Amino acid sequence: MIDIKSFNEYPDIDKPRRLRKYVLIWCSKGTLKVMVDETELKLKEHEVLTITSGQIHYLKNYRKAEGCILEFTVDFFCKNDNDIELIFHNGLFCHFDLNEVIKIPNHGVVQTQLELIKKELLLKPYQHYISIHSRIELILVEINRAKVERGDEIWKPDALFLKFIETVRANFNKNYSLEQVARKLGTTEAKLNEQSKLHTGRTAQNVIYGLIASEAKRLLIYQNYSVKEVAYQLGFNDPFYFSNFFKKHAGISPKSYQSKYAL
């Protein structure tokens, strides 16, 4: 549900891992590198990186760095639509795999709240989960302020759009059509298209295609699957159709992509 550990407390943090949690990596001292899917990012002192649920990641060159990793599930944090919108505000955990390193000028706030979260989890005082939820809110607000201060455009998607993305991510193997996703969310295809165009400039169907292509890349890089197995994992009945789909969206065949990037 929620956990926080310093870098040296995590076993095998230098091995690729995938969590159905939202991950926040905080560097308080030194430097380290983080691989997220196929992208390498460098964190320096007082910088933070957010990783969306399902993204594969691991640390590199972190032995001399200090910091911690906070992980929490969507069920723990998102009690209402306001929580959903905060967690994805300004692309914090909804960046379509364009992870970014964020420098925090007012770093003392983040450092203090992370330390207090760790203390709450250790001692478990009365209503500690409520306290932790509030402290995560403070951290996310501080990160949002840092992004605004550096000139980033404010991006605040509607909760429905975020539920749409999460539904697709949670059901890759079912290969839901847009109609099926809309039905699960109790809305319409037209409404999802409206939200998708508003927040991404793309149709809802193209958002789905993009999410599937990103998931295919993860499976090709980090899992010991053949192209055929990846196709079936993503709900494609025809591996040839999957190969054409992947090449259209990635600009390279799945076999070539796997040969180029696989560990």
Give the predicted meaning of each segment.
Residues M1-K44:
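Generic protein-terminus/edge-of-domain signal
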Residues E100-K103, L123-S131, V141-L185, L198-G210:
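Short, Lys/Arg-enriched, Trp-marked, Pro/Gly-tolerant hinge/linker segments that flank
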